[in-house]
């Protein structure tokens, strides 16, 4: 059995100033206090709901792999307000197992970061980016941990891929980022 639980990240992206920022990052604590740790789902839900009150959220993509029941509730509450949608039937769903789409979104983020077009804020989010390793596959490059049981988290970087993907879809849909501060979130 794996001894390290993945983190959960809720990452915002400002279309106005092109900045990625952590809204919430939940990681398994080290040592005995990390034994039996689980992501605090109620806390994550509260942060998502607070983000919709605080920001003008135009897109919110989340990998439903472990969150499908919660995402269905978020879709019922917020799906109609989103300008960009993961799919027609599930506006928040964005499966991370769709390799070719993940590769394209990863390349998009990598290009923007390497060209200085996106600012990454928060020490924990920066650490997640530094922990991410390039993994080449048949479809292209994705990110991964250094090894599967690595305690070094990359979930914030993975969440950032979806935040930027939602942002690029918003721009393509004509969301005007100059009038108001427009932010997107991903969990």
Predicted ranges, named:
Residues 1-99, 103, 107, 111, ...:
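RNase H-like, metal-dependent nuclease domains and their acidic two-metal-ion catalytic environment used
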């Amino acid at each position: 059995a794996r001894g390290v639980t993945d983190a959960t990240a809720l990452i915002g992206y400002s279309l106005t100033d092109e900045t990625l920022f952590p809204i919430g990052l939940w990681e398994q604590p080290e040592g005995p206090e990390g034994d039996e740790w689980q992501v605090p789902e109620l806390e994550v839900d509260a942060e998502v709901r607070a983000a919709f009150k605080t920001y003008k959220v135009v897109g919110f993509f989340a990998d439903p792999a472990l969150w499908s029941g919660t995402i269905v509730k978020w879709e019922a509450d917020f799906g109609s307000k989103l300008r960009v949608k993961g799919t027609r039937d599930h506006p928040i769903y964005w499966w991370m197992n769709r390799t070719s789409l993940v590769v394209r979104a990863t390349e998009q983020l990598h290009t923007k970061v390497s060209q200085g077009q996106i600012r990454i804020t928060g020490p924990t989010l920066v650490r997640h980016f530094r922990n991410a390793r390039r993994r080449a596959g048949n479809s292209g490059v994705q990110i991964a941990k250094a090894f599967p049981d690595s305690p070094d988290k990359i979930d914030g970087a993975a969440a950032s891929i979806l935040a930027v993907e939602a942002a690029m879809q918003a721009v393509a849909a004509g969301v005007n980022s100059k009038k108001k501060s427009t932010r997107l979130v991903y969990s």
